[in-house]
């Protein structure tokens, strides 16, 4: 990390610049690590530039069709068996719509190459060492680095064991409603024709989500941090590229939290990096194994119930003539509705009439309320055909079906476009320290940053071992007089040194010049009693050395020594508090339409309604003259089914009808409301730490930096009183006495006041993006979310493209009787048949079993699009199916689906633990020089440290010149 200098201490003498160090050897890059397990999907990064167009893939195989939904109508009375009609022709295959060209998918671009690292600037001279200032408040957290470029995806790891079945996701919103085609002419209803060829495969689903990113490589270990020099006074040089980050030391004991400083001004955004050239295209993946068909889908919503079709009177058996298709006759005038005649007796079946022209569709009738349940009456004679009723009101959705069996996971979809950037996650815990990476080239010295705020007072260090006595240095210039320091505690007297030998008596020297007046001595003593004047005695021996005086005031701070080697890392610090969750990010761009989900199991059929009361038997009426065609009356209630006559002869097969026109597109439906946000899953487990990498080479030593400013002058010590000159010549120097015992440590100085918090510096430029960490292990399956509320019906999607016709299937067995078709146009009136005897009402037969499902018939012409049904309630969430085997890759790629509406932004997930550090990436280009910060305020001087070890006893000084003769003594007593 970047070391923050403490407040400036008093300046010492300016040191000489040292020679620049030689660059260390370049380290080797470690071997690549083993590919990790595929990590869980990380947060979606920003959307990259589109790559060059890719090739279209192959069409996937069409899935098996699901079972048709069941519909239960009201139980009708059993009708007599109807005549078997002629077998109709197979419908012509519908025209295949033009498939829109699939948008080419671009190949991913390769990450841009980083620029060459710049030269490292010269290393600055070591500044004077200041006294430890009080610890400043903790600085505000720096801005997060820019997101690094994603590394190339790692190789696919081996497939893991199948996971536990997870919860089935909620049903997706219905797609936009497709345009309703124009209604074609109504065809003649014939017997079901033979199954036609299988329909063409539908267009391929939308591309799936992007694949998971490969595991990120481990971060390189930060290099060794250089010794921080204090800023010099010279002009700032050009900013070089940032040096490699130093090794992360173990966290120390957490200090007292500082007050939060004011937020600095927001810096200008850095220049945008140059976009790298696109990378090479990846290899084409192998074709996966074919997936198993999905489970049978749920039945669709029941269609609108059509009114009963008109039933013609059976004609007499006639000879089957050649079947010709007549041209449709002109529409007759609209007459007033006639009274309903009594139903006639059932006549003999007549010859099948010619096919009439299709009539225009009538309005939809409304479904009447169900009548009370009556007893089953015997079926009456057939009544006249009623007019087509209007379409009934949409029924209520049936009860929620039981949970379906878990479906097998489908094949992996084509990667979709990148989604929106999610909201900022919470700060994760600090990851394990990665292996040291190769050291980058030395960077130039940056401009002087703003002075930091004073830190808290540090704890006193342990007493160091006294070092060896250094060689005497050159005499420095006399310093300025400092402020008087605090007086230290007097140490114990040292042991007396050995007594020196008596010197030889010297010759009396010449009278010396008068010396300079001495400094004022100590306190004036009380005058003693005057003794008798003695005769001058002989020169005495040199006295013993007196006890050592008290320690002097602290001297001037010395020149700061060279930085020592970096100590071992301290213990790991306590983890920091978890940061608050960031604000939700803006909604991202509209994502691609997801692949259709698996079809669920059909739900149980709804309860049957009550049967209506049977109508009373009518009396046969007299045959009237045929009147004019009446106008279409209001929709009447459905009449009971009449008896069916014997089957007539099978007619010739008619020619196929003309191809219907393609319908026009209807208006799109309204957009549905967004669904509710899902619950946040639990955080995933911590990732394993990567193996430590080899140590990086030592970085080059920086060159000489600008000279630092001279600090304020220190406080000079008090001047001691000069000693009296000793008599006689200089004696030989005595031997060094033993070192005195270290004095007791002085009292703890008063803690200085807390310094003023410095003004915040301007915000620096945005640093280079950090290396992406590896993705953590996949998170555990979260609990299944509660079933969401039923959303409004979504818009109906546009009609899909018609696929190519499939192979012809075998003829299926006859299915259950279909719902009544629309009214056909009345055919030519046949000759009246002889009245048949009314048949006895037969008992209601049991419902027959459903026949075996036939093969898919030929694709018929596209019918008119029905109205969008009401969306059923969401079924219960089923368990998650096992992951299916990867299917073989199709021959060609499907068309791109339409882009769906943007979903609501999800709630921010909890930040997972940081993964192991990836390998060191290439060094980025140097950033532009930041604006210089404002000068910080000087901190208050720190407390006085404990007294140092006792110094050596000095050598005896030279003998001074003889003093002037004293005054004559008083006369002696007589």
UniProtKB/Swiss-Prot annotation:
The keyword Phosphoprotein applies. GO terms for cellular component: extracellular matrix; extracellular space. Residues 303-312 have a biased composition (Gly residues). Expressed in bones. InterPro entries: Collagen, Collagen_superfamily. Residues 1-974 are annotated as: Disordered. Residues 56-73, 880-894 have a biased composition (Basic and acidic residues). Keywords: Extinct organism protein, Extracellular matrix, Glycoprotein, Hydroxylation, Phosphoprotein, Secreted. Residues 152-164, 637-649, 792-802, 828-844, 959-974 have a biased composition (Pro residues). Residues 1-14, 25-44, 98-114, 132-150, 198-228, 352-378, 387-406, 504-517, 581-595, 608-635, 664-680, 709-718, 730-742, 804-826, 865-879, 908-941 have a biased composition (Low complexity). Trimers of one alpha 2(I) and two alpha 1(I) chains. The modification 3-hydroxyproline is found at residues 682, 946, 961, 964, 967. This is Collagen alpha-1(I) chain. Belongs to the fibrillar collagen family.
């Amino acid at each position: 990390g970047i070391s923050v200098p403490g407040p400036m201490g008093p300046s010492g003498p300016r040191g000489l610049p040292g020679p620049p160090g030689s660059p260390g050897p370049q380290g080797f890059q470690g071997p690549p690590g083993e590919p990790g397990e595929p990590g869980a999907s990380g947060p979606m990064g920003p959307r990259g530039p589109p790559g060059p167009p890719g090739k279209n893939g192959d069409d996937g195989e069409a899935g098996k069709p699901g079972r048709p939904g069941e519909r239960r109508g009201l139980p009708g009375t059993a009708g007599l068996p109807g005549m078997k009609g002629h077998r109709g022709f197979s419908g012509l295959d519908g025209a295949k719509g033009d498939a829109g060209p699939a948008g080419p998918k671009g190949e991913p671009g390769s990450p841009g190459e980083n620029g060459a690292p710049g030269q490292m600037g010269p290393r600055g001279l070591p500044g004077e060492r200041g006294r430890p200032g009080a610890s400043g408040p903790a600085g505000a957290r720096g801005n997060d680095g820019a997101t690094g470029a994603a590394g190339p995806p790692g190789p696919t790891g081996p497939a893991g064991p199948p996971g536990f079945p997870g919860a089935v996701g909620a049903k997706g919103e219905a797609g936009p409603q497709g345009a309703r085609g124009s209604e074609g002419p109504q065809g003649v209803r014939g017997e079901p024709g033979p199954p036609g060829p299988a329909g063409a495969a539908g267009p391929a689903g939308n591309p799936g989500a992007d694949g998971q990113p490969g595991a990120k490589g481990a971060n390189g270990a930060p290099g060794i941090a250089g010794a921080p020099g204090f800023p010099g006074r010279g002009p700032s040089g050009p900013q070089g590229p940032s040096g490699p980050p130093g090794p992360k030391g173990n966290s120390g004991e957490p200090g007292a939290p500082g007050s939060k400083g004011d937020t600095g001004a927001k810096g200008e955004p850095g220049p945008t990096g140059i976009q790298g050239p696109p990378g090479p295209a990846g290899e084409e993946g192998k074709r996966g194994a074919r997936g198993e068909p999905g489970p049978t889908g749920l039945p669709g919503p029941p269609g609108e119930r059509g009114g009963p079709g008109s039933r013609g009177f059976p004609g007499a058996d006639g000879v089957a003539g050649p079947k010709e298709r007549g041209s449709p006759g002109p529409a007759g005038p609209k007459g007033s509705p006639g009274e309903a005649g009594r139903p006639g007796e059932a006549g003999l079946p007549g010859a099948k009439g010619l096919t009439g022209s299709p009539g225009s569709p009538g309005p939809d009738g409304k479904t009447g309320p169900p009548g009370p349940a009556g007893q089953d009456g015997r079926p009456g004679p057939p009544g006249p055909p009623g007019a087509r009723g209007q379409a009934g009101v949409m029924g209520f959705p049936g009860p929620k079906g039981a949970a379906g069996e878990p479906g097998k996971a489908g094949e992996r979809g084509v990667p979709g476009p990148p989604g929106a950037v999610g909201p900022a996650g919470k700060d994760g815990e600090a990851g394990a320290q990665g292996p040291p990476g190769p050291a980058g080239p030395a960077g130039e010295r940056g401009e002087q940053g703003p002075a930091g705020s004073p830190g808290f007072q540090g704890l006193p260090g342990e007493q160091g071992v006294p070092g060896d006595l250094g060689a005497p240095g050159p005499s420095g210039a006399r310093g300025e007089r400092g402020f008087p320091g605090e007086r230290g505690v007097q140490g114990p007297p040292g042991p007396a040194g050995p007594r020196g030998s008596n010197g030889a008596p010297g010759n009396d020297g010449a009278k010396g010049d008068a010396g300079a007046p001495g400094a004022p001595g100590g306190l004036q003593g009380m005058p003693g009693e005057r003794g008798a004047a003695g005769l001058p005695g002989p020169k005495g021996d040199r006295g013993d050395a007196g006890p050592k005086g008290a320690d002097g005031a602290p001297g001037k701070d010395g020149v700061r020594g060279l930085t020592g080697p970096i100590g071992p890392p301290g213990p790991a610090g306590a983890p920091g508090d978890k940061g608050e969750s960031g604000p939700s990010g803006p909604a991202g761009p509209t994502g691609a339409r997801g692949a259709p989900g698996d079809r669920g199991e059909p739900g149980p059929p709804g309860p049957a309604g009550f049967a209506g009361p049977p109508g009373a038997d009518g009396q046969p009426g007299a045959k009237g003259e045929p009147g004019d065609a009446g106008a279409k009356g209001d929709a009447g209630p459905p009449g009971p089914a009449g008896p069916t006559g014997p089957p007539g002869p099978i007619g010739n097969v008619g020619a196929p009808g003309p191809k219907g026109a393609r319908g026009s597109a209807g208006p799109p439906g309204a957009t549905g409301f967004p669904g509710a946000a899902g619950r946040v899953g639990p955080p995933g487990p911590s990732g394993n730490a990567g193996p430590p990498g080899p140590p990086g080479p030592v970085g080059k030593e920086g060159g000489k930096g600008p000279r630092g400013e001279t600090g304020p002058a220190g406080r000079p010590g008090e001047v001691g009183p000069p000693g009296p000159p000793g008599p006689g010549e200089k004696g030989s120097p005595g031997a060094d006495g033993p070192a005195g015992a270290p004095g007791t440590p002085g009292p703890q100085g008063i803690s200085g006041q807390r310094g003023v918090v410095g003004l915040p510096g301007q915000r620096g430029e945005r640093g280079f993006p950090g290396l992406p960490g590896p993705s953590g292990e996949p998170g555990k399956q979260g609990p299944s979310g509660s079933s969401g509320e039923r959303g409004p019906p979504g818009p109906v999607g546009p009609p899909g493209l018609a696929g190519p016709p499939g192979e012809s299937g075998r003829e299926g067995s006859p299915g259950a009787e279909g719902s009544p078709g629309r009214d056909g146009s009345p055919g030519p009136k046949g000759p009246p048949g002889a009245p048949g005897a009314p048949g006895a009402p037969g008992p209601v037969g049991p419902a027959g079993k459903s026949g075996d499902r036939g093969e898919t018939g030929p694709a018929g012409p596209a019918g008119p699009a029905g109205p969008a049904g009401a969306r059923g309630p969401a079924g219960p969430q089923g368990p998650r199916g096992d992951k299916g085997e990867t299917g073989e890759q199709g021959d060609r790629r499907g068309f791109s689906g339409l882009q769906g509406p943007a979903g609501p932004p999800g709630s921010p997930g909890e930040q997972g633990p940081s993964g192991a550090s990836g390998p060191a990436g290439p060094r980025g280009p140097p950033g532009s020089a930041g604006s210089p910060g404002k000068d910080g305020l000087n901190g208050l001087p720190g407390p006085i440290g404990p007294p140092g070890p006792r110094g050596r006893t000095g050598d005896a000084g030279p003998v001074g010149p003889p003093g002037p003769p004293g005054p004559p003594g008083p006369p002696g007593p007589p």
